[in-house]
Amino acid sequence: MIIFVMKKIFFITPVQIILLSFLLFNCQAQQTTNASLEEAKKAIAASNEIYFQAFAKGDSSIFIDRYAKDCWIMPPNAPTLCGVDAPHEFFKTAYNKFGLRNGKFITVDVFGDGVEFVTEEGFWQSFDADNKLFDNGKFLVLWKKTPDGWKMFRDSFSSDRNK
């Protein structure tokens, strides 16, 4: 292929054409991935904003709706809870046994391709009925894009306090 630019002749080989098209395609794919990741970040922030309302209102359905049907919840010093009943079991324990009534997530980062899965890392705080901090720690959550939106697929967290 011959290209004329300002009275100069440039020859472009098939290899150069392939490399140029790959470069352009890669830039477009990167923009799509960035848009998907931003969409995931917004959905996660919205989910996190209402997560602890479940405990403040005593409404497990708000909590359960944050999780994928095939989720795993991996709390500290306890067995892993798996499947559709895992969120309800965790809610009952946190609400009744530990007196969780409110909390806060502090997201440090969300990373991944934003297409099927993303990972969120951060810190959490748990408060009792008197709004007293009784536990805090860190978390890693693998989020999964489902037909119902972004849901927690693997939720692993640990406490910064002694048992």
Question: Where in the sequence are the language-model features?
Answer:
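Bacterial Sec-dependent N-terminal signal peptides
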Residues: 1-35
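Short, low-complexity N-terminal intrinsically disordered segments enriched in polar/charged residues
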Residues: 13, 27-65, 69
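Hydrophobic pocket/interface hotspot
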Residues: 51, 59, 63-64, 71, ...
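A short gly/proline-enriched turn/hairpin at secondary-structure junctions
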Residues: 66, 71-82, 93-98
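A mature extracytoplasmic/lumenal domain signature
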Residues: 67, 77, 122-124, 156
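Surface-exposed, charged secondary-structure patches
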Residues: 89-129
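Solvent-exposed, non-transmembrane alpha-helical starts
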Residues: 131-133
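Short beta-strand edge/turn micro-motifs at domain boundaries
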Residues: 136-161
